Amino acid sequence: MGKNVVVLGTQWGDEGKGKIVDLLTEQAKYVVRYQGGHNAGHTLVINGDKTVLHLIPSGILRDNVKCIIGNGVVLAPDALMKEINMLKERGIPVEERLLISEACPLILPFHSALDIAREKARGNKAIGTTGRGIGPAYEDKISRRGLRVGDLFNAELFAEKLKEVMAYHNFMLTEYYKVDAVDYEQTLSDALALADYLKSMCVDVTELLDNARKAGEPILFEGAQGTLLDIDHGTYPFVTSSNTTAGGVATGSGFGPRHLDYVLGIMKAYTTRVGAGPFPTELLCEVGDHLGTKGHEFGATTGRKRRPGWLDAVAMRRAVQINSVSGFCLTKLDVLDGLKEVKICVGYQHPDGTISKVTPLAAEGYEQVTPVYETMPGWSESTFGATFLEQLPQAAINYIKRIEELLETPIDIISTGPDRNETMILVSPFN
């Protein structure tokens, strides 16, 4: 029987999920996105050729894989078309490989307009969203006024629903945020123009995945963002608007949770964060500059510079608990090459002097703690491109083993470079 594997980020996103999903899809028949939208940025490097995907699952470059956008994903038709056209220009037969749930909420121009207006109004209290309308689209879904992909297939009803929801949002844009309204006729025309094309790719995702499971076909679920950005379990309110954790797989795809076999947590050998929000182990020093420069830490979606810091084992321990992580993939180990010492945060010191090994409830709690570090020797040798554990310097192996001890979870895969083949798979999630 085939295994059903979840790949998700355990930090604040940007852990290197895209590369690992692409690598593992060699053994998968289906790759499923189950949450988020085109705020994700998954970078694949194959034989030096770089591809950045925001909405389409990372298995799209494999000719043996069907890629599915599940109901938990908020879908911007214009962003999807841009990505499809980019791939088609490179000779990828997207229509043969991509399938979409009719239940995906739509992101429309007024969602992006609201997102941008809100961030501007917040001033120095901005959340740091991508401005792509993700949050407002999820709000409409929860408020039961959102439009979904399937609504496009009844033009008259879609027009009626769109008029109602746009009247509401345009009032907010013009009267509260004092910005221009979004044009209804243009929004309607642009959306309906893609209706037939999108309909040709729509399927009953729950039925499809359940049949695949019964047939023993391996399925890979691809998470976006990271655990610490989860709407419920992250550094609230500096979070995304979806459940980025393993529990989101079932709700965002319609796949039964009892049938998930393995959860692979992707974790950098250090930590980064994009945008605003608390970050206990952030390094505002030369070491931070080293990590940011050597790790090419710029967001794949926004281009924003990422904030680097040491690995936070306290936060990673919570990620293990929330996600039932079976094993980790440690990425960007090579970025630590050349450092005299490396540190791991093993506790949080609170203002009253007490030390805890659990994460606070929300952002305010994170902002009050000071990291307690364990220091280990660094290594001068290069780990870049290593494909066998024996090729690593002993100090790097010791660092890996210490992480495993602290998290009580094995590191099953180690990434030592951006390319597909710069990876050592110690234990395959599908085996």
Curated annotation (Swiss-Prot):
GO terms for biological process: 'de novo' AMP biosynthetic process; IMP metabolic process. GO terms for molecular function: adenylosuccinate synthase activity; GTP binding; magnesium ion binding. Its main location: cytoplasm. InterPro entries: Adenylosuccin_syn_GTP-bd (IPR018220), Adenylosuccin_syn_Lys_AS (IPR033128), Adenylosuccinate_synth_dom1 (IPR042109), Adenylosuccinate_synth_dom2 (IPR042110), Adenylosuccinate_synth_dom3 (IPR042111), Adenylosuccinate_synthetase (IPR001114), P-loop_NTPase (IPR027417). CDD domains: AdSS. One of its GO terms (cellular component) is cytoplasm. Pathway: Purine metabolism; AMP biosynthesis via de novo pathway; AMP from IMP: step 1/2. It is found in: Cytoplasm. PROSITE patterns: ADENYLOSUCCIN_SYN_1 (PS01266), ADENYLOSUCCIN_SYN_2 (PS00513). IMP binds at D14, E15, G16, K17, N39, A40, G41, H42, T130, R144, Q225, T240, R304. It catalyses: IMP + L-aspartate + GTP = N(6)-(1,2-dicarboxyethyl)-AMP + GDP + phosphate + 2 H(+). Keywords: Cytoplasm, GTP-binding, Ligase, Magnesium, Metal-binding, Nucleotide-binding, Purine biosynthesis. Plays an important role in the de novo pathway of purine nucleotide biosynthesis. Catalyzes the first committed step in the biosynthesis of AMP from IMP. This is Adenylosuccinate synthetase.
